[in-house]
A protein has these predicted regions:
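N-terminal glycine-rich phosphate-binding loop and ensuing alpha1 helix
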Residues: 2-54
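Conserved beta-loop-beta/alpha segment of the NTase-like Rossmann-fold superfamily
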Residues: 71-142
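Short helix-boundary/capping micro-motifs
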Residues: 223-229
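Key DNA-contact positions within bacterial/archaeal DNA-binding proteins
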Residues: 227, 238-239
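Residues within the DNA-recognition helix of helix-turn-helix
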Residues: 243
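A short LG(V/I)-centered, amphipathic sequence patch enriched
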Residues: 249-269
Length: 307
């Protein structure tokens, strides 16, 4: 299932060290990264957590991210979280962007510059210092996963062909452990994430398709298991079926096929029509996103109405 060109990973894992819900301005740092990813069209976005973090799920529930639970719940290292995210996205995207949650202040323009640069591993640099996020191709994922040394992510990337991109963005280095620095960058970062916020839905007499249901169908197609799809999307089992049943009533055909029983406990998968619907919606969403970004840039950024 290679539906998108760029997938994203945000490593949270060690909640105490990472501080994903640290408020900088009016929003938590993890929300800043999700917004930045979404502005350049990253999907799916995978958040790697170290346990059942209900507060985090509530914070991100409306943003359509995938929650992956790390097996080593207590004190996973950064590389462990990277590995979990890469294992999930391998084969699903042509490129993957990664950032630890405690580096939240890089801008959408910086990320777009990295994505516009060809290279197996693309790393931003500010005044000679490398930072985050890091972009790598799907072909590099097996090499990162195969690393077994003691130097973590740095060691895994050390022998890979890296392309450095100079950026005028100190946010690639700003760390949540230095809250004063985050706050110094706040005004500039808030300006960088000004964007047209389209919360797309399909409606009939009432809304019947949203970002949450899009993600749920994506995960059903990926896992063929409703409970796993619900756990990874942060949607309750009963709510998931309510949304699917409403969608099927409005469309007039089955979107999800239920197979009960058997040694495996049954499975859930998209019907051919359901898969076609999801693919068409994603293509539609991409086209609307690109059009909106272009119009916003033309009417507000290039005219310097917003600077």
């Amino acid at each position: 299932m290679n539906l998108r060109k760029v997938g994203g990973i945000i490593a949270v894992a060690n909640h105490e060290v990472a501080k994903p819900l640290l408020q900088v301005g009016q929003i938590p740092i993890i929300r800043r990264i999700v917004i930045t990813y979404q502005q350049v069209g990253v999907f799916p976005i995978v958040v790697v957590v170290g346990g059942d973090d209900e507060d985090l799920k509530r914070e991100l529930s409306s943003l359509g991210v995938i929650f992956l639970k790390h097996e080593q719940e207590r004190m996973p290292e950064l590389m462990d979280s990277v590995r979990t995210g890469l294992q999930y996205l391998q084969g699903k995207c042509s490129r993957v962007v990664f950032a630890p949650v405690n580096v939240p202040m890089f801008t959408p323009d910086t990320l777009q510059s990295l994505l516009d640069t060809e290279g197996d591993v693309v790393v931003p640099s500010w005044q000679g210092r490398g930072g985050h996020p890091i972009v790598l191709t799907d072909e590099m994922i097996p090499k990162v996963l195969a690393y077994s040394g003691e130097n973590g992510l740095r060691g895994a990337l050390e022998d890979l062909p890296r392309t450095w991109v100079d950026v005028d963005d100190k946010g690639i280095l700003a760390n949540a452990h230095d809250e004063e620095e985050l706050n110094r960058q706040l005004t500039a970062h808030n300006l960088s994430i000004v964007h047209p916020a389209l919360h797309m839905k399909l409606e009939q007499e009432e809304p019947f398709f949203s970002a949450r249901l899009k993600l749920l169908l994506y995960l059903i197609d990926d896992t063929n298991n409703m409970r796993t799809a619900c756990a990874r999307s942060g949607v309750s089992h009963s709510k998931a079926w309510d949304m699917i049943n409403r969608l099927e009533r409005c469309l007039g055909y089955s979107v999800v096929e239920r197979q009960r029983g058997g040694k495996s406990g049954g499975s859930t998968r998209l019907t051919p029509q359901g898969a076609d619907f999801l693919a068409a919606y994603q293509e539609f969403e991409q086209a609307v996103h690109q059009f909106t970004q272009n119009e916003f840039k033309k009417r507000f950024i290039l005219t310097k109405i917003i600077e």
